[in-house]
Amino acid sequence: MRRIYSFLIILLMMSAIPAFAQKGGVIKSRIVSTDNTPLQGAIVSVVGTSSSAISDENGNFELTTDQRKGTLRIVANGYYTREYPLKKRVIPREIVLVPDNFSYYAGTTQYPFYSERRDTRSAINASLDRRDMKNSISADLAWQDGISGLQVVKKSGMPGEGAFFNLRGIHTLVADNAPLLVINGIPYFYNSDVSNVINGYSRDALFGYNANDIKSITALKGAEAAMYGSLGSNGVILIETQQATSDNLNTRISFTGNYGVSLAQNAIPSLDATQYRSYLQDIGMTRYSSAADLRNDYPFLNPGRNAYSYLFDNNIDWNKEITRSAFVTDNVFRIEGGDEIAKYNISLGYTNEGGIVDNTSSQRFHTLINSDVMVSRWVDIFTNVNLAYITSDLQEQGMKYETNPLLAATFMMPNLYPYTRESNGNLLSSYATYNSWNVNKNPVFAYDNVSNPLALVNTVEADDKIYDVNVRAGLNWRPTENWTITGMVNIYYDYTEESLFVPGVTDQAIVPQLYGTGFNYVSKGVRKLSSY
């Protein structure tokens, strides 16, 4: 009886062998698109072997292989790659490929030293390909709303500042919440500090990279992040840039240009001159003992015209005075190709981001040079060189009312004028001084003087200049068909030079710095950051 059972089990196992193995190792199938259109020229291969075939005009192919294990891969231009395990199931008679303009299909998730199909990976990890990212001047803002659990929030409207991002929300109010960035398998330690020169300003994390040079990102939130130790305690974001790894050896030249306008739309609501006069009248009576004392310090509260009407007879929206629509552009020129020995992928780009605060902008010149050279059948050498040069015209931010133009515009009285007015009505080209409206030399309460917002955006010089270099070189050695040993070296260098000049002696339109003792304020700093 046991022999009969054994015979039946063997018979069942033999019947479970894939159909192509029973026919001498021949795989036959038909490749179609989602609309049932036959796909001609699709490449079918068994990964790791020389067995391959190409589909004909009817989408049919026939491939001979003696492999019972491994992966069957189907590649077609303009479609997602599809794979089937030879061991687990019979290859279907009709294989459907999905066009790559569909978002979030299977694809692959890229890890530091291997890739994994998205439909087989851990659900706690997520990835995003370039085709699914947003068009953005900032590389990190291109990920916004792309990955579940990855929070990306733009820091401010200042050009070049980028975004704050974290995984699974804020974990601490003291330490850093940002996840570890890993670019092409190498941890990326960027300058995340707030500037000591330009108040409230911090650089974009990926300021040296163009969004078009990012091939894919993967967010690690689970056990996979443990390989980075305490550095990965806030999660890990794996970034893969464009590489010289395409199987298409034809020389390809492309240009991508994006042009647009940044609009200053939603300003903080502020009082007009009439509303402010009513507000000051009400709030003033809670401090002053009499209306006469209040009107003596603020004569524009008196009904009708008076000797000081030329100073206060205005209605200015200060936010509109210092903001404007700004032009933005992002341009990338790319050339890629190669031959059987060497491949290359080179991009050159120029980015100009105008800020909505007048006279602010950021310009970037960058290049990404990738190469892959096959030294022998078992050895190849690869390099990635990213170079960027950035210059910016900025303004101070944060709770510094003397030099933050947006804060000054919020505090400034709407009935004052940005330029000097004479008592006879003549308008001068010089900026109104910060205390030009102080009509009483001995006020009951000290005047709350505010810097002239228009003078801030036109005379303050806040600049930065950055040289950023990131070089990676490596070697792949394949001692056997199933083993690959990779060695890499990475050098990162960042040079940042910042300067700030706040004038005050000539026009006296800006509240003096250093507790009222410094009329001209100069600050300069240099930061050098390197890692390898």
Residue spans for each PLM region:
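Short acidic/polar hinge/loop motifs at secondary-structure boundaries
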Residues: 61-64, 186-221
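Flexible, surface-exposed loop regions and adjacent strand-edge segments
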Residues: 197-199, 270-277, 363-366, 398-407, ...
